[in-house]
Amino acid sequence: MGSMAKSEATAFTQSLAATAASDAAIAEWYRTTNYETLWTGPEDAARRAALLAAIATAGDHGLPVPRYDATALTVALQSAETEGDRGRVEVEMTRAYLAWAQDLTAGALEPQKIDAGIVREINRIEPKVLLARIANGEPEAVLAWLLPKSLQYVQLMKAKLGIEAQIAAGGWGSAIQAVALKPGDTGPAVIALRDRLVRMGYLAPSAVASYDRAMQAAVTAFQLNHGLTADGAAGEGTVAELNVGPEERLKSVIVAMERERWMHFDREVKHVWVNLPDFRAKIIEDGKTVFETRVVIGKNVPDQRSPEFSDEMEHMVINPSWGVPRSIIVKEYLPLLQRNPNAVSHIQVIDGRGRVVPRGSVNFGAYSARSFPFSMRQPPSDGNALGKVKFMFPNVHNIYLHDTPSKSLFDKEVRAYSHGCIRVADPFALAHELLSWQTDNAEAEFEAALKTGKETTVKLKQHLPVHLVYFTAYPDAKGRMTYRRDVYGRDAVLWGALSEAGVELAGVQG
């Protein structure tokens, strides 16, 4: 190598090493490969072009474009005049590739830094693995391998592009200037209702200016897709949802895509899917819903909102006793007992050795929330807070699915009333479904255990993954987008974090 070539190589290496010094993984990669280029050498054209093409689609994925910035990298490549410039661009492209790969496969945000109620284990692929893949593999295949593969993600991305096209075409028309509307009504508000339903795809174009049967059917379809009571009348809640603009729906879809990236792992062929804002639990098998039931989730107050996490269901307990959570004991029951020692008489007071303590022997007034030394338990009974069966997937949150004697809450549209656990509307049917995978007499065996009145644990021979999720935007079985209210306000917080990271709404100003 001549002196000029040596000096150029030295300038490239020194510039690359200096630029990569602040990133240990990148610096280590180039040291171990003797500073072999990935992007800026003459033989790197295909890899370079594939990366630039991939990151140019960042906006389509609802990812922060400035984090990868294909345009800026292209300009940097074209304007690199010296070997020092080339060394800097080499590292910039590697950083963009790693950021792109990490964000696509595990999300652009760290969820628990955004909301403590989102407990997702984000398993990010190590940089050296990602770099080895792109260095040794066919570039386009490697970049395709990074893309989320779930059908839901693909459908969300399609919905995102569709909403953006609708926004560019003028949106969904004027807001409905009415609190509520009903079949038979006429006037400007009904025309606005008609026009929005047409633009949303629920109603065929029409000049009809009255709330007729076709409009009633369209409203019913809208209600079904938005978790509303499907009565065909545009009541206050329905009008409020109809008036939500496409920009807000777009935010919901982008947030849902980020949540999908957090769950970029094998969800198993068979699993339980509890979508909190939908107030429903499903068993999914081979991509199809084989069981579905309404649920009640935690109240929208601190410490009672149901968390988002994944675990495995291991067993069910028939005729369960209820071990009262410490928070309920000291916040709710202790004050009652201090006023009246015979309050909540259906609950037993238990000492540290597991013995039932006579209430007359306890001076409840002598204890504070911190010093109260007893636990409390409700034995199996018809009025037990957990009903007749609970479904356990042991976790640090002490969250599980269970029956309840309070059935009336399942008729409500918004079902956020528990202390955090998931109450199930059809617990016996759920038990039968779970047991049917391990016995031919599921119903009979369940009923036999139930009739004993005794607490009975039934282990599941095959543990079942359980995913508690929070999607306010998701495709239904036919691929049509459905939306739910942001009951805990988590989507609003996530959108704020994504926006701060550089995610923008395409075609929306301000």
Which positions does each model-derived feature cover?
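Well-ordered beta-sheet/strand-loop patches within structured domains
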Residues: M1-W29, V91, L98, I118-V119, ...
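Cationic-aromatic interfacial patches
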Residues: M1-I122
